[in-house]
């Protein structure tokens, strides 16, 4: 289904480096590096995860730039030989491990480039998530700008009209938006990133003691540069990816292994139990529409904390 998403985007030539070879650390090295990562997480007060397409491949959704990625094969005139529909896909071990790490207090925020909706399906609360490129399960009102969860993947990408009325009158708060029309909120190449998601992503990346990139080559900007925001303040940066990334030379630690394997080991070392996916916690399986908007109050509250942090770092140290 990521093939259909890619096909729905406008033509664009600069897709970055495609098909770079993957490398794998030995089991012994992976174990040592996971121990090091677990220690870094323990010592950090603010951990931010940056997730890319590589965390969803074990759900049957192809990535884009891997050896068998959508765009890599597209260049050869081919299609991936596996391509689960978005509606069939279920959150991976990584998605569920992220839930556990947040609930146990080890991770404070997640910034995702993925549009597949698997963070949403996993039950991750919106207050912990920035979705920089949109979400195939979200409908956004053109008038009131509120976002709502769709029970199935929306029909379009590129912020096109879904020809449906705003769902605000159907939500639990009973607020109504007259004459609002819903659009998909999946970005095309020329679109600006969603303001609140980007602002929260920038702030969390900057104040992080530890930024961890999971399953991404970090080629798309500005998303791929966010994990570097904390380096000038002495923060740490870890990469878990099978291919080389744009910022390997700046990382404190690089783990070349499947993300599912890494987070399973890290959770075990931290004494964190990874839950199974449950439809009861999946907003796409609920009977009533659920709102998915980032409240402006959340952005303003964290912005005040961010300003204090920046003032302390740049003026008092």
From Swiss-Prot:
<dbReference type="GO" id="GO:0008340">
    <property type="term" value="P:determination of adult lifespan"/>
</dbReference>
<protein>
    <recommendedName>
        <fullName>NAD-dependent protein deacetylase Sirt6</fullName>
        <ecNumber>2.3.1.286</ecNumber>
    </recommendedName>
</protein>
<feature type="binding site">
    <location>
        <position position="113"/>
    </location>
    <ligand>
        <name>NAD(+)</name>
    </ligand>
</feature>
<dbReference type="GO" id="GO:0031452">
    <property type="term" value="P:negative regulation of heterochromatin formation"/>
</dbReference>
<feature type="binding site">
    <location>
        <position position="259"/>
    </location>
    <ligand>
        <name>NAD(+)</name>
    </ligand>
</feature>
<dbReference type="GO" id="GO:0004407">
    <property type="term" value="F:histone deacetylase activity"/>
</dbReference>
<comment type="function">
    <text>NAD-dependent histone deacylase that acts as a regulator of life span.</text>
</comment>
<dbReference type="InterPro" id="IPR003000">
    <property type="entry name" value="Sirtuin"/>
</dbReference>
<feature type="binding site">
    <location>
        <position position="53"/>
    </location>
    <ligand>
        <name>NAD(+)</name>
    </ligand>
</feature>
<feature type="binding site">
    <location>
        <position position="177"/>
    </location>
    <ligand>
        <name>Zn(2+)</name>
    </ligand>
</feature>
<keyword id="KW-0539">Nucleus</keyword>
<keyword id="KW-0158">Chromosome</keyword>
<dbReference type="GO" id="GO:0046969">
    <property type="term" value="F:histone H3K9 deacetylase activity, NAD-dependent"/>
</dbReference>
<feature type="binding site">
    <location>
        <position position="215"/>
    </location>
    <ligand>
        <name>NAD(+)</name>
    </ligand>
</feature>
<keyword id="KW-0862">Zinc</keyword>
<dbReference type="InterPro" id="IPR050134">
    <property type="entry name" value="NAD-dep_sirtuin_deacylases"/>
</dbReference>
<dbReference type="GO" id="GO:0070403">
    <property type="term" value="F:NAD+ binding"/>
</dbReference>
<feature type="binding site">
    <location>
        <position position="144"/>
    </location>
    <ligand>
        <name>Zn(2+)</name>
    </ligand>
</feature>
<feature type="binding site">
    <location>
        <position position="141"/>
    </location>
    <ligand>
        <name>Zn(2+)</name>
    </ligand>
</feature>
<dbReference type="GO" id="GO:0000122">
    <property type="term" value="P:negative regulation of transcription by RNA polymerase II"/>
</dbReference>
<dbReference type="InterPro" id="IPR029035">
    <property type="entry name" value="DHS-like_NAD/FAD-binding_dom"/>
</dbReference>
<dbReference type="GO" id="GO:0017136">
    <property type="term" value="F:histone deacetylase activity, NAD-dependent"/>
</dbReference>
<keyword id="KW-0479">Metal-binding</keyword>
<feature type="binding site">
    <location>
        <position position="65"/>
    </location>
    <ligand>
        <name>NAD(+)</name>
    </ligand>
</feature>
<keyword id="KW-0808">Transferase</keyword>
<keyword id="KW-0520">NAD</keyword>
<comment type="similarity">
    <text>Belongs to the sirtuin family. Class IV subfamily.</text>
</comment>
<feature type="active site" description="Proton acceptor">
    <location>
        <position position="133"/>
    </location>
</feature>
<dbReference type="GO" id="GO:0000785">
    <property type="term" value="C:chromatin"/>
</dbReference>
<feature type="binding site">
    <location>
        <position position="133"/>
    </location>
    <ligand>
        <name>NAD(+)</name>
    </ligand>
</feature>
<feature type="binding site">
    <location>
        <position position="166"/>
    </location>
    <ligand>
        <name>Zn(2+)</name>
    </ligand>
</feature>
<dbReference type="Pfam" id="PF02146">
    <property type="entry name" value="SIR2"/>
</dbReference>
<feature type="binding site">
    <location>
        <position position="71"/>
    </location>
    <ligand>
        <name>NAD(+)</name>
    </ligand>
</feature>
<dbReference type="InterPro" id="IPR026590">
    <property type="entry name" value="Ssirtuin_cat_dom"/>
</dbReference>
<dbReference type="GO" id="GO:0003714">
    <property type="term" value="F:transcription corepressor activity"/>
</dbReference>
<feature type="binding site">
    <location>
        <position position="241"/>
    </location>
    <ligand>
        <name>NAD(+)</name>
    </ligand>
</feature>
<dbReference type="GO" id="GO:0006325">
    <property type="term" value="P:chromatin organization"/>
</dbReference>
<dbReference type="GO" id="GO:0005634">
    <property type="term" value="C:nucleus"/>
</dbReference>
<feature type="domain" description="Deacetylase sirtuin-type">
    <location>
        <begin position="27"/>
        <end position="273"/>
    </location>
</feature>
<feature type="binding site">
    <location>
        <position position="243"/>
    </location>
    <ligand>
        <name>NAD(+)</name>
    </ligand>
</feature>
<dbReference type="GO" id="GO:0046872">
    <property type="term" value="F:metal ion binding"/>
</dbReference>
<feature type="binding site">
    <location>
        <position position="64"/>
    </location>
    <ligand>
        <name>NAD(+)</name>
    </ligand>
</feature>
